[in-house]
Amino acid sequence: MKNTADITVLGAGSYGTALAISLASNGHRTMLWGHEPEHIENLKNDKSNEAFLPGIPLPDLLIPEADLATALAASNNVLVVVPSHVFGLVLTQAKPLLRKDSRIVWATKGLEPETGRLIQDVAREAIGDEFPLAVLSGPTFAKELAAGMPTAISIAGTDPQFTKDLVELLHSPKRLRVYANDDFIGLQLGGAVKNVIAIGAGLSDGIGFGANARTALITRGLVELTRLGEAMGAQASTFMGMAGLGDLVLTCTDNQSRNRRFGLALGKGSDVETAQDEIGQVVEGYRNTKEVYTLAKRLGVEMPITEQVYQVLYKGKSPVDAAKELLSREKKSETSSAE
């Protein structure tokens, strides 16, 4: 089947729209699907996504589409950008509509709720093993990417040609630098764990701790991410790159991060429900914390920061008590295999 679009993006939220804007601005005909017809109609009429990225115009090559069948027929390249808790549902709906030559890439960050499975496992359960899969990850705030500010990401996948094609498709000399990576597991894991550590950084700042504490959390958070990654077969070097250190620093230090702002609100005394309401959008790190904590316990991986964030979110522990417990842990060598 001949393509009528170079790529189809599933998910018309802030990040999906930002990636679609970047692709279309780079000369690629891009179809953007959203599950709410009224929202898609607004995109067409306003020529912008006022609900998520107000004031940023949509390029002429970006085509909003409310019909999933039409969107999936338009291109064999499918970029999924939906929250982790609906990822499986969206792909299950897409399965009978996919072309035989479809190739699936996602920018969804996180693990499957309840099970803690990697997104690749959710994808394979939903659509089978016959389609090439890939993931893109890295330090990206949707608003900056949509506005054309320089950004860098990494891509890894199951098929080298698909990865190469995605690099060519997404790379833009003016706005987006794309690195190929061969660590499919590592790129998926980095996007989940960084959300947990970002909540921890927000908690620390909300309590009133300073830059020293925040930096320590980021550094030791990177250790936790690397430790879990190696236990799952990822490469330690991956976490020194865009999907590890890059995403971690961005999410922990800038208030554009919903996860960081969520932690800030909790540190200042809000309860979980109020803090989520204040953000007004999905806080992936809330679910990710339980998933990462459960996964670490199952694998026997020590992740003390993750454990204390979990205790605050799900067991009602005060942020101050969580910080005290981290500080009072047994003294150990920084370079030992266990923290």
Curated annotation (Swiss-Prot):
It is found in: Cytoplasm. The active site is at K194 (proton acceptor). Sn-glycerol 3-phosphate binds at K109, G138, T140, K194, D247, S257, R258, N259. It catalyses: sn-glycerol 3-phosphate + NAD(+) = dihydroxyacetone phosphate + NADH + H(+); sn-glycerol 3-phosphate + NADP(+) = dihydroxyacetone phosphate + NADPH + H(+). NADPH binds at S14, Y15, H35, K109, A142, R258, V282, E284. Its EC number is 1.1.1.94. Transmembrane segments: none annotated. InterPro entries: 6-PGluconate_DH-like_C_sf (IPR008927), 6PGD_dom2 (IPR013328), G3P_DH_NAD-dep (IPR006168), G3P_DH_NAD-dep_C (IPR006109), G3P_DH_NAD-dep_N (IPR011128), NAD(P)-bd_dom_sf (IPR036291). GO terms for molecular function: glycerol-3-phosphate dehydrogenase [NAD(P)+] activity; NAD binding. Pfam families: NAD_Gly3P_dh_C, NAD_Gly3P_dh_N. Keywords: Cytoplasm, Lipid biosynthesis, Lipid metabolism, NAD, NADP, Nucleotide-binding, Oxidoreductase, Phospholipid biosynthesis, Phospholipid metabolism. One of its GO terms (cellular component) is cytosol. Pathway: Membrane lipid metabolism; glycerophospholipid metabolism. GO terms for biological process: carbohydrate metabolic process; glycerol-3-phosphate biosynthetic process; glycerol-3-phosphate catabolic process; glycerophospholipid biosynthetic process. Catalyzes the reduction of the glycolytic intermediate dihydroxyacetone phosphate (DHAP) to sn-glycerol 3-phosphate (G3P), the key precursor for phospholipid synthesis. PANTHER family: GLYCEROL-3-PHOSPHATE DEHYDROGENASE (PTHR11728), GLYCEROL-3-PHOSPHATE DEHYDROGENASE [NAD(+)] 2, CHLOROPLASTIC (PTHR11728:SF1). Belongs to the NAD-dependent glycerol-3-phosphate dehydrogenase family. This is Glycerol-3-phosphate dehydrogenase [NAD(P)+]. It comes from Shewanella pealeana (strain ATCC 700345 / ANG-SQ1).
